[in-house]
Amino acid sequence: MNPALSAVSDACERGKVVNAAWRRYGAINSLALAALIAGWAGSRTGEADRKRLSPREQGLRSARDAAVAAVAVTGVAAGIQGVRFSGMEPEGAVPLENGSEPDAGASPDESRAKRRLNLLGALHLASALTLAGVNAALREAGPGPGTGSRRRRFSRR
């Protein structure tokens, strides 16, 4: 979105455009977060008893639980902070230099709020990437047909 915002000459108009786009994206992001949590809860109830898992699998399962929690907490926190930030000016017209940086005309409170929002967004991305990595490791470590490394599956033949 940042390259397209360079065509908007007024800093307050850039804020309106960015906040309007994020409001629409927020609904989709909320649905995605709900689906992630529902999928995690469903898979968690259907998993093997902890006693039947290897120590590595137990550790990965705990890491996945922590990563899902981090994705949920940072996602909700970013959503709340985004709504607060957008509400600092009528129609979300907080002066922005681009999609990520406050304009010089932004108040100190607005600048701090934007920096917090950027930090929460980065933490949310990092937690989502961590979750993807843990899920990949679990897929490799998991027992049963269709799981484990290819090398291990093919060496059985």
Where on the chain are the PLM-derived regions?
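Short amphipathic, positively biased membrane-proximal segments
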Residues: 1-157
